[in-house]
Amino acid sequence: MRKSLVIVLLMGACLGNAQAQLHLKANIQNNHLWRGMEVSDGVVLLTDLSYTMAHDHVTVGLWGGTNSEGSYKEFNHYLNLKAGGWSLALWDTYNFSPGANYNNHQYWNYSAHSTGRFLDATLAYHFDEKKFPLTLSWSTVIFGRDRSSDNEHQKYSTFVYAEYPIYK
């Protein structure tokens, strides 16, 4: 008990001077794309509730989406750490889609062989936004329903991209 109290007090002292912001965002779209794949068509409502702290270096959030037919539902938790142009994001993604070939009935199941979720890690570098607004990103599914056909091994599917705005 005493150690827990000391840890909580130290964390409070470290974060006591840090600025924090609460963000709530909602989008209505005509479909939902993820890494170039259509996840849902039709009218889609996407929401994001996040809390940013430590002078914009740490963000934790909840992200959700659903479509107008109710055939697509998604709920994610995420953590994003930023420092010196670098960012590391960890996303815990869970879809509640009917007809899925994965377990979408046990939300808290984190068993590697039977979970319906996946954990995604993204490492990105953001160059100077005013001089050279390029972002390079590497994302890998590190756990969950990205398994080999015999369900024995994680496949570690990876998505790499470069992003450069041509019009602002």
Could you say what each language-model-derived stretch is?
Residues G36-D41, Y72-N76, G99-W108, D146-H153:
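Outer-membrane beta-barrel translocator domains and adjoining extracellular loop/strand segments
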Residues Q19-N30, L81:
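Transmembrane beta-strand segments of Gram-negative outer membrane beta-barrel proteins
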Residues I28-W34, M53-H55, G64-S68, A83-G85, ...:
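Transmembrane beta-strands of outer-membrane beta-barrel pores
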Residues N109-K168:
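Detector for outer-membrane/organellar transmembrane beta-barrel domains
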Residues A20, D41-L45, S71-F75, T115-L119, ...:
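Residues that define the transmembrane beta-barrel architecture of outer-membrane proteins
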